[in-house]
Amino acid sequence: MKLKYSNCFVIIGFFFTTFFLGSVFVVASYGVMNQNLLQSTTGGSLEVNITTSPEVIAPNKEVKFKINFLEPDTDKIQVHVDYDFQVLKNGEEVFSAAKQINQPLLHTAEGSVTIPFMFSSPGSYSIKIPVLGINFIPINPEYAEFKFVIN
């Protein structure tokens, strides 16, 4: 009798796992970014956290990227960061927030910024955030990069 119920639990567990994992893969393929992306810069000087609004990213619809610069291994906002916000499609830059205002870089005094962007077509994209200075002190360029697909 125990064996019969054990098999039942295994089968039910298999179906639930398949259902939920299948849902995750379907959602990911439609341009949903993880709503709490956190990555260290290549040199480890900062951690970069990105959230999106709306959650589902679609072509020809504006999405707002909220970027928080954090001190490494903490939840503390790092103030006075020199950076850029770049969008790359298939490895080629299609947008640079700094170039939009004819500047080599941007500066956030608060350590947090929201940047709107509209993807014009489906494809493989990266959000690249180069960091060039912290607290008014230039650093060797570092970056955080987040990759995703828009369908």
Predicted feature locations:
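N-terminal soluble domains immediately following signal/targeting peptides that reside
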Residues: 25-151
